[in-house]
């Protein structure tokens, strides 16, 4: 499992290559990603966050072992080789337990790390940047690094215990603002300064030395920084290379290190490519993929309404709206404004809080009903042209079957293709 260290080695040798990380637990998104990687014969990096998946189940109800089993079963069913599959854990640390005292939160974080590593996750993002209940705000670099080193030691010991060797690859540091898209309206974003990046690295190097972990430094492959990319509900802050030039040059002094960029969703293909060239060579993408899934489902729901009598329709959009109103906990602290603004955000926001609702049984039943309704007879081509014009071109050329499932998968793969192209290198 040396895909990542080899990618970093090639990048440092001037190949301008990278890798994208699929950050989603949705079965259709994962199927789209696995099939795309298979068709292009590339490794595939799939990541779970500490919110989605933890030793208690996270919001998906899955432990790390469950998530691995789910992904591997899907990969097997699609004949994707498991040695080309890399599993990563994102923002692993006390993130979920910030409301607890630090001692308790870090004990939970120890167990979180053990559960991820024991399940076979090989890319581990150590993030202890968040203050716990009895911590100062913000934490110093030294405290953050000491906690990360403690978790690295747990990870190394767990890996040796379960696999007989320590072959983990680490990412350190964090971006600002919080994971998953900004809550507020944005206009500009501060880029991480070279001094701040250096301070994070040196604090971690020192803390790792104190834990007797000098030997793992070459396996710390990336530092998470903010290159100046973010999105809110209706806007995207595009990458501006000039603003990140000093940061980009700084990492050239570290022979085994690149940058990892979070919240790259909705960047233009040109910006994604430039990020990789500028050494932000691990690109995280999540909401943009479930946003594409949602787009495809809304388009198919519109087609269904044209073809199927109202009483026989799935009513997917109304079911979705009803469930989101009944259980507002995943969106109400993110979406603001009057009733109409919040309604629009629930359906269309770039932050895509709707992604938390797809596993709901009522919504899943409506989705299955929609697919059944449209699978009974061929979807008329003019309706595909109207509602899924990019897929229509591929249907007409014979490269895409016009079934509901294939149209959804292909629409998601259009986003993956942008990331693949950005990461290919010279």
From Swiss-Prot:
Give the protein's biological function. Answer: Component of the tagatose-1,6-bisphosphate aldolase KbaYZ that is required for full activity and stability of the Y subunit. Could have a chaperone-like function for the proper and stable folding of KbaY. When expressed alone, KbaZ does not show any aldolase activity.
**Quick one: a GO cellular component term?**
plasma membrane
- Pathway assigned to this chain's UniProt record: Carbohydrate metabolism; D-tagatose 6-phosphate degradation; D-glyceraldehyde 3-phosphate and glycerone phosphate from D-tagatose 6-phosphate: step 2/2
Q: What is this protein called?
A: D-tagatose-1,6-bisphosphate aldolase subunit KbaZ
Q: What is the lineage of its organism?
A: Bacteria, Pseudomonadati, Pseudomonadota, Gammaproteobacteria, Enterobacterales
Please name the Pfam families in this protein's record: GatZ_KbaZ-like
Which species is the source of this protein?
Answer: Escherichia coli O1:K1 / APEC
Subunit comment: Forms a complex with KbaY.
Q: Which GO terms describe its biological process?
A: carbohydrate metabolic process; D-tagatose 6-phosphate catabolic process; phosphoenolpyruvate-dependent sugar phosphotransferase system
What family is this?
Belongs to the GatZ/KbaZ family. KbaZ subfamily.
């Amino acid at each position: 499992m040396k895909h990542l260290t080899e990618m970093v080695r090639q990048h440092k040798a001037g190949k301008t290559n990278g890798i994208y990380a699929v950050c989603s637990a949705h079965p259709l998104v994962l199927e789209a990603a696995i099939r795309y990687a298979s068709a292009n014969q590339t490794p595939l990096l799939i990541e779970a966050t500490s919110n989605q998946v933890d030793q208690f189940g996270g919001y998906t109800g899955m432990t790390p072992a469950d998530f691995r089993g789910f992904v591997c079963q899907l990969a097997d069913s699609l004949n994707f080789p498991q040695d080309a599959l890399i599993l990563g854990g994102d923002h692993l640390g006390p993130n979920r337990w910030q409301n607890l005292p630090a001692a308790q939160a870090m004990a939970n974080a120890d167990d979180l790390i053990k559960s991820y590593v024991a399940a076979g996750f090989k890319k581990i993002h150590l993030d202890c940047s968040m203050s716990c209940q009895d911590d100062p705000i913000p934490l110093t670099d030294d405290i953050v690094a000491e906690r990360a080193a403690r978790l690295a030691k747990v990870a190394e010991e767990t890996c040796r215990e379960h696999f007989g060797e320590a072959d983990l690859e680490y990412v350190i540091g964090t971006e600002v603002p919080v994971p998953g898209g900004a809550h507020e309206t944005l206009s500009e974003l501060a880029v991480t300064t070279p001094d701040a990046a250096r301070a994070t690295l040196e604090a971690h190097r020192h803390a790792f030395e104190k834990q007797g972990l000098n030997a793992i430094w070459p396996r710390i492959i990336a530092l998470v920084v903010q290159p100046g990319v973010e999105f809110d509900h209706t806007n995207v802050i595009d990458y501006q290379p000039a603003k990140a030039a000093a940061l980009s040059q700084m990492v050239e002094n570290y022979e085994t290190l690149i940058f990892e960029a979070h919240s790259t969703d909705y960047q233009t293909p040109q910006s994604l490519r430039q990020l990789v060239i500028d050494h932000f060579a691990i690109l995280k993408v999540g909401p943009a993929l479930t946003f594409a899934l949602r787009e495809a489902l809304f388009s198919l729901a519109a087609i269904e309404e044209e073809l199927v009598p109202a009483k026989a329709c799935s009513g997917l959009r109304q079911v979705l709206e009803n469930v989101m109103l009944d259980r507002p906990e995943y969106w109400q602290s993110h979406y603001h404004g009057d009733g109409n603004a919040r309604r629009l955000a629930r359906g269309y926001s770039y932050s895509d809080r709707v992604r938390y609702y797809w596993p709901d049984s009522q919504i899943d039943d409506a989705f299955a009903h929609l697919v059944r309704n449209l699978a009974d007879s061929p979807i008329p081509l003019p309706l595909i042209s109207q509602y899924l014009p990019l897929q229509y071109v591929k249907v007409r050329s014979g490269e895409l079957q016009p079934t509901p499932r294939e149209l959804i998968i292909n629409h998601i793969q259009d986003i993956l293709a942008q990331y693949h192209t950005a990461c290919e290198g010279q």
